[in-house]
Amino acid sequence: MKSSSNLKSLLKNIDRKGYHAYKSTQGTYDFGTYFLSIDHVQGDPFASPSKLSIHVKGRSAGFPASFYDTKYKQVALCDHLTRLFYQTLSKISFRAKGSGKSGLFSVSKCGQQVLERTTCTIDPSNGDISVHFEAGFPANGRTVNARELDKMLFGLLPDCVSSSLFYKNIDQKMLESVIYLSEDQHTIRKTLSSMGLVAFIADGSVLPRENGISQKPLRNCVKFQSPDTYRVSFELPHQGMITGMGIPKGITLIVGGGYHGKSTLLKALELGVYDHVKGDGREFVITDPTAMKIRAEDGRSITNTDISMFINNLPNGKNTVSFDTEDASGSTSQAANVVEAMETDSSLFLIDEDTSATNFMIRDELMQRVVLRDQEPITPFIERIRELYERYGISSIIVAGSCGSYFHPADHIIQMDQYIPKDITTVAKDAAKDFPMVSLPEKKHPDPCFDRCFNAGNHLKKERKIKMKTLGKDAFSINKDTVDLRYVEQIADTEQTTALGYALLYTKLHLMDGKKDLCAVADELMQIIETKGLSTILDSKYVKSNLAMPRKQEVMAAMNRYRKL
């Protein structure tokens, strides 16, 4: 292994040469307390920045083993270190000068959710830490400006590494609180199901966000307060006794007037599948980890999905046991979203009336009298909701503000009244007796068919070059084919979208074989990631710093929206 002095000498030798001379710097260098790896050098100063990584031996980093002895603690620790490294690195970015991206330092900017990322990892066997980031190697025009790179790597970077990646130099109390919070959150998650619950919202939680494009908490808002009938408590290892609203398994209806907080509560539950940082307000909003938001998605593609549970006898004679379309309607898209969620082993559906297809959710009495059952291809969700719970163990939480039909099948009815939840189950059930359901549930339907098998991506293998490009949080493209994820609403971070793009590529090129069904492929992928790490799915020789761990549910959602599946 080369020493840092070797790198210093090399930089002197290549100064003012053509930019391509930077390629000779690739390798790993010993900086005494850490190792710097130059993993990939950009082709010119205007190209994507160079890829670098820092490696600190566990005995030097000095983090207590009790802070990374479980997976969830490792994620919390690495998330915190990434935030610290980002704070210090952003202060020195562009202090070195030059053309193009010269002087840039860049690393993942974490949001409110705590996610596993390729940016920072820790080896649980010895505490070794690796951090991956980007840097723009300085140039004058298109010639090497080695003096400025020397400034970046020897003058600026060492202090960033020292102040953020060594236990003795960081705020130890703050880190301790991060680890303790992760333990408390994990305690609730692991006991939620055994308590008969699908979600928990702690008293005092702050659910609304400051605006429509921010995930930061709204100041001076009404804090969450559980109704007595739904209040449960958890004894946490560090927080102690905590109380809040436990939403039981079964069918829960959330009602209330407009702007009273129904959708805000549901949105918090959607993201409750992730841990949140201290101060977010949703630290103890915990949802079943398999929960899926279900909505209408006009225009999406559907490939060989069995939607016959909800759609049958189409006038064009189209087969709904293996349904295909490039342009789904509201009802067929929502039917597909339900069945595909079942395929992912989801045990909780989250549904908002505002984003649902009305004809998929209900058929009122007058419509049933005018358009007879044998003339209607759609079996509405209301007729399947009890079967989904009693037969498949899938609970539902539904937000409704204009339709009272779901009072009948609901087990629990909660009214949001000026942002405060109230238990109105008895009152609502009594009122519903005066409006009996005319629609009778159909006989039980055969289990949906989940044997969809897809061939390897031969069309991709024929391509001379395969390019995956992330298009913000809501989409990615593989060559010229865009995968639209706008309505996969539980993606929390752009780096998850990037990971989904590489995951889809990996499954098409390495796992799909025409024999394994889609769920088996997804399970195999998740097992590979669990065993070998998220960076396994990359197509490069170096670890990219821009991947965040998605759930199996989003992995399969991305697969299902790929139009060349």
What are these regions (language model features)?
Residues 193-199, 203, 259, 266-297, ...:
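Carboxylate/His-rich catalytic cores and anion/metal-binding grooves
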Residues 208-243, 278, 286-291, 295-302, ...:
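N-terminal pre-Walker A segment at the start of P-loop NTPase domains
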Residues 300, 310-331, 363-378:
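Flexible beta-alpha connector loops of hexameric P-loop NTPases
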Residues 341-385, 389, 402-408, 412-429:
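Conserved P-loop NTPase nucleotide-binding/switch module
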Residues 416-497:
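Conserved P-loop NTPase
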Residues 484-565:
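Terminal-proximal interaction/regulatory segments of ATP-powered molecular machines
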